[in-house]
Amino acid sequence: TMQAGDTEAAIPFTIDFNDIAGNVGTQVTGLTSGSSITYDETVPTLTTVSIASNNSEGATLATVNNIITLSIVADENIQTPTITIAGNAAAIATGSNGETSYTATYTMASTDAAAAPIAFTVDFKDMANNDGAQAVALVNDLDGGVTFDKQAPSFTTVSIASNNATNTLAKVGNVVTITLASDE
């Protein structure tokens, strides 16, 4: 049984044996396949966790039907992670079991809550089943989070006036001013 603090490496072993007649067999110190079992107690970590949107106005903005991409890089090979974006299961777009880099995507829906920033989770473990700490924050992402805004803007005030003595009329040389106030 492996114990915490044991050396992380290929596990050495020897097998000494005899047959029922007492003949000593050749000592075995390795698997006939040439493979080995490696002891690993180190918890994996994520060195990069970044998020972006495909919104044409910028990677930190999202609206309904925008695709959110979460990218991660681990410090060692990990099993395919479980990723949520805005509380929904994200589809793994790149990376396969036993790699260090993965991307996951989710298309924002009208049923998703507006958020600034969009929340996410990344659950992952290394190939030896050591659980990494759930990621809920960005790591080495220079842009910051993505804001999901699903509300269309509207004007709360729209007015027009001229600098004519009667501000509802205009003639050549008068300046017409339109004043708009938006809800966002």
Positions of the model-derived regions?
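Tandem-repeat architecture and repeat-register "anchor" residues
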Residues: 14, 20, 42, 49-52, ...
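Flexible, low-complexity linkers/stalks enriched in Thr/Pro that connect modular domains
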Residues: 29-49, 136-158
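Short proline/glycine-enriched turn/loop motifs at strand-loop junctions of beta-rich domains
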Residues: 73-80, 181-184
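Repeat-associated, polar segments at repeat-unit boundaries in modular proteins
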Residues: 17-19, 35-36
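Short acidic/polar inter-strand loop motif in beta-rich domains
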Residues: 19-24, 126-131
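Extracellular beta-sheet repeat scaffolds used for adhesion and glycan interaction
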Residues: 1-7, 11-14, 27-33, 55-60, ...
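Structural beta-strand segments of beta-rich domains
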Residues: 66-70, 174-178
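Intrinsically disordered, low-complexity linker/propeptide segments enriched in Ser/Thr/Gly/Pro
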Residues: 1-4, 179-184
